[in-house]
């Protein structure tokens, strides 16, 4: 049995990455998001908690005594230096957790053909080499804002959609319905599953 084909989903805020990830899950892929991994680290890693308190103070802790994402976001998204520091703290840990997850999948008696991870800053942090295939999900800025994408300066740090599409193996312009996206993902899953099967021969 071959190892799962490693796929990354990337794209701008509000483009529909999480919706696409859920579709991949429905169609048989193992899935995890970078946000899920970060949430796990904030709640369970004492070294992360200590580093955050030393940098920002106890004000970033929530009522349960663990780092609160909204309080951290309030601090860092208006301070480029603080955001850079946070990314340098978390990205190596997220990468470690992701690789461990992928290794555990490969050890299963019947591993999935495809494992998919949502990585918003894939190209920005140079993580694309860790994946076999990259899927870019894009949508016009006005549509993403209508979906609730914040206008707090985060977009300024991201590569333009055009460049992401050029660098990705597959791209989808998400201007339609969730059902239309789901159909596209189903077709892509069939392609990826077949590719992994061929590679295993």
Q: What do the PLM-derived regions correspond to, one by one?
A:
Residues 31, 133-136, 171-172:
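Short, well-ordered beta-strand core segments
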């Amino acid at each position: 049995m071959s190892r799962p084909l490693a796929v990354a989903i990337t794209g701008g805020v509000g483009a529909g990455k999480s919706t696409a990830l859920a579709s991949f899950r429905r169609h048989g892929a193992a899935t995890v998001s970078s946000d899920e991994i970060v949430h796990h680290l904030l709640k369970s890693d004492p070294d992360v908690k200590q580093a955050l308190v030393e940098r920002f103070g106890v004000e970033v802790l929530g009522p349960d005594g663990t780092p609160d994402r909204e309080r951290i976001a309030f601090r860092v998204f208006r301070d480029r230096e603080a955001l850079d520091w946070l990314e340098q703290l978390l990205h190596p840990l997220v990468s470690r957790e992701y690789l461990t997850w992928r290794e555990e999948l490969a050890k299963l008696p019947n591993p999935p053909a495809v494992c998919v991870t949502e990585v918003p800053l894939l190209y920005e942090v140079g993580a694309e080499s860790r994946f076999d295939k990259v899927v870019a999900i894009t949508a016009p800025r006005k549509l993403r804002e209508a979906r609730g994408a914040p206008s707090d300066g985060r977009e300024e740090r991201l590569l333009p959609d055009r460049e992401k599409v050029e660098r990705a193996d597959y791209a989808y312009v998400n201007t339609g319905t969730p059902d239309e996206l789901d159909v596209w993902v189903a077709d892509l899953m069939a392609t990826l599953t077949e590719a992994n099967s061929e590679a295993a021969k």
